Regions:
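Conserved H-loop
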Residues: 211-217
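A short, surface-exposed alpha-helical micro-motif characterized by mixed small hydrophobic
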Residues: 224-226
Length: 237
């Protein structure tokens, strides 16, 4: 868990042919407490998603600082920021099973020697000579799957899942890494009303259970009022 702070954060996109430069964020000062669920609301184009992308390291700020757990991470690559992001589009790997999608971030973390890579590959493809590391990953995947009611779906591919199940897999992939911060960018937009309500309650329950600092972007006022500890309204940067 970690506190998050944006200090005089600005983001400007350079001019394109025939148009001027666009300043999307105009000196944001915002603090998110450790373990807090903060909801960002505002009209389309106001900079909500850009703020998350700056925190995740997917874009660089033009000016200002992004601080996580008291450390300025503005110049760090995404892999060193200890954040996990859930997108509106699920972003699942279609050729990987539910289990492998959940485990993907765990297997990608850190640098492994060739021998360890080969051993893990043998373990996944044959089921024997399972390395201690691969065993820990399998146990973590099972734990997360049970938490999200996905244990009976671990062998399925994304194309065999409903929209709600896909979103739970995306959540599982983020949870499995045990990050310091969760970032959620309109994760329920593609779901129908009933699934949206069910998944909304599940996200809130998981966040309270895990206690992970969470920034959640939505344009839905009902989501904002029912999910967050606090709401931050963003308008025109």
């Amino acid at each position: 868990m970690a506190e998050v702070a944006f200090r005089q954060l600005r983001k400007q996109y350079p001019p394109r042919r025939g148009s001027a430069a666009v300043e999307v964020l105009k000196g944001i000062d915002l603090e998110v407490r450790d373990g807090e669920f903060l909801v960002l609301v505002g009209p389309s184009g106001c900079g909500k998603s850009t703020l998350l992308r700056l925190l995740a390291g997917l874009e660089a700020p033009s000016q200002g600082q992004v601080v996580v757990a008291g450390r300025d991470v503005s110049a760090l690559p995404p892999s060193r920021r200890d954040v996990a992001m859930v997108f509106q589009s699920y972003a699942l790997y279609p050729h990987l099973s539910v289990a492998d999608n959940i485990a993907f971030g765990l297997r990608r973390s850190g640098h492994r020697r060739l021998q360890q890579q080969l051993q893990d590959w043998v373990a996944r493809t044959t089921g024997w000579l399972r390395s201690p590391r691969e065993q820990r990953i399998a146990e973590r995947v099972q734990q997360v799957a049970e938490m999200l009611d996905l244990a009976h779906l671990l062998d399925r591919l994304p194309k065999e899942l409903s929209g709600g199940q896909k979103q739970r897999v995306a959540l599982g992939r983020a949870i499995a890494r045990q990050p310091a911060v969760f970032l959620m960018d309109e994760p329920l937009s593609n779901l129908d009303a009933k699934l949206r309500g069910d998944t909304r309650r599940q996200i809130v329950q998981l966040q309270r259970q895990l206690g992970v600092t969470t920034l959640y972007v939505t344009h839905d006022q009902v989501e904002a009022m029912t999910m967050g500890h606090r709401i931050a309204v963003l308008n025109a940067g």
